[in-house]
Amino acid sequence: MRRVFKITFTVVVAIVLIFSISSCTEKVPKIPELVTGFSGNADVELGETKLKCNISHTEKGVSSIIISSPENLKGMSFKNLGGTYAISYNELICETEKSYLPSSCFAQAITNVLDKASEENGAIYQKSEDNNAIFTGASKSGDFTIYADSKTGIIKKIEIPEINFTANLTDTKAI
């Protein structure tokens, strides 16, 4: 009887030890996939300039940015059609096969960051904090930080400190 008790006790202790050791392993957080194909609105600050715009961007690099505020620029659009670029305002359209916008232009900065983030390893996950997944990378417009929803991967904010650029995105939906 004592022998059966010792064997049973040893088995129970072994099982408890196995479960306690396995529960101590650190759980690696799931890294969200960054969603670069989306449409939404953005409040943009570039130095002293403040703009509101509508943004649409695909993972293939096709983008459209239309200014909605200030009133004197309302309706101006910047489009990258995957090799063809177009700027339009009040029925005036300039279309070219090369982007002539400087990399510090707000529309070019947004496009540069989103295009880079669409590339494999173009935006590197750094950490998660306050329900934000934080990604960093380098684009033609400068080093950037992207804040995305840690569950959905939808971009909420883009920063490029070198050109004093911030874009806060709202009403964003994956496309």
What spans do the regions from the language model cover?
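Sec-dependent signal peptide recognition
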Residues: K6-A14
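An acidic-aromatic
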Residues: H57-V113, E162-N168
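A short, compositionally biased
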Residues: T36-S39, N80-G83, K151-T152
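Gly/Pro-enriched, hydrophobic low-complexity segments
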Residues: S64-S69, G122-I175
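N-terminal leader/targeting segments and the immediate start of mature chains
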Residues: R2, K6-I7, F19-V62, N72, ...
